[in-house]
């Protein structure tokens, strides 16, 4: 049976925390392998990340905080790792991360592979480390060979498993996995799944992260304009079909980018009848 996992971002208000509590409690009924919580640009939400993770853990569920290294010193990261260890956390999602708006590149880590190596150097095998990978290539990647090479650097540094950027073309995932296997990488590569709720928001996210919205899907979504119900129905059908194809093709599980909403991710998972 395939695994699932669900990603949140830390809320900024008491109302947001209450809403997120209802979200993860609903998704917990689906028995996920773990929940994860993002870290904010430049680590800007690190306290909220830890608070969210610990609340989920206190309810008896596995939760993994993200940790990013952009704009961070080794001392910063060492202190954050110690906070996680002191709280019994053993599962991390390690990323380079994004700079806060208006800041130039800084910090002592250039790549996510450097962060993974530092975690292993300072913490040994304490943490299970998830990393990111990009079947449709990172926006800064120059060519296909570089994408696999960069991913291999993270694996060689000590990554245990990987979560992909979201995509809507299953063939991109299968091709990327084949390239990774040919390069000797055997770790689990779990597809990231983005439910579709709002086309303009999705287009903005996709332009920023390099995820392609296939032409047929883009035109279909554009035709619905502001018809939220039609977009939701189409999105459920399209993303559910994508997930079915991924699992049938051997994907080890699915990681849902929930945007702190339970309904669509839960409905897609239930449609898969797993």
Predicted segments, located by residue:
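Short, well-ordered coil/turn segments that N-cap beta-strands
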Residues: 1-3, 31-34, 59-63, 88-90, ...
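Active-site mouth loops of central-metabolism enzymes
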Residues: 3-19, 41, 63-75, 128-146, ...
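Conserved, mostly hydrophobic/aromatic
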Residues: 7, 35, 84, 154, ...
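Short, acidic/polar
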Residues: 14-27, 49, 74-82, 143-153, ...
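Active-site pocket-lining/capping segments in soluble small-molecule metabolic enzymes
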Residues: 15, 107-134, 183-236, 241, ...
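Active-site-adjacent beta->alpha loops and helix N-cap segments on the catalytic face
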Residues: 15-17, 43-55, 73-79, 98-119, ...
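Catalytic domains of carbohydrate-active enzymes, especially glycoside hydrolases
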Residues: 25-38, 156
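Catalytic beta/alpha-barrel core
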Residues: 34-45, 67-69, 93-95, 160-169, ...
């Amino acid at each position: 049976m395939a695994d699932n996992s669900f990603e949140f971002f830390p809320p900024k208000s008491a109302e947001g925390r209450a809403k997120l509590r209802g979200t993860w409690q609903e998704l917990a009924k689906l028995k996920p392998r773990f929940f994860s919580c993002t870290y904010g640009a430049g680590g800007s939400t690190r306290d909220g990340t830890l608070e969210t993770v610990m609340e989920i853990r206190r309810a008896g569920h596995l939760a993994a905080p993200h940790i990013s290294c952009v704009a961070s010193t080794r001392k910063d990261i060492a202190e954050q790792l110690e906070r996680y260890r002191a709280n019994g956390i053993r599962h991390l999602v390690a990323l380079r991360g994004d700079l806060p708006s208006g800041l130039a590149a800084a910090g002592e880590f250039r790549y996510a592979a450097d962060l993974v190596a530092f975690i292993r150097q300072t913490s040994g095998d304490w943490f299970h480390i998830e990393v990111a990978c990009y079947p449709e290539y990172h926006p800064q990647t120059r060519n296909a060979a570089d994408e696999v090479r960069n991913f291999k650097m993270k694996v060689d540094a000590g990554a245990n498993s990987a979560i992909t950027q979201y995509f809507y073309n299953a063939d991109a995932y299968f091709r990327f996995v084949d390239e990774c296997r040919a390069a000797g990488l055997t770790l689990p590569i779990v597809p990231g799944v983005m439910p579709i709720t709002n086309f303009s928001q999705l287009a903005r996210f996709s332009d920023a992260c390099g995820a392609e919205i296939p032409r047929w899907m883009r035109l279909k979504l554009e035709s619905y304009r502001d018809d939220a119900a039609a977009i939701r129905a189409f999105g459920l059908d399209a993303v559910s079909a994508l997930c079915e194809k991924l699992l049938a093709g051997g994907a080890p599980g699915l990681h849902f980018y929930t945007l702190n909403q339970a309904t669509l991710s839960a409905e897609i998972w239930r449609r898969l009848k797993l």
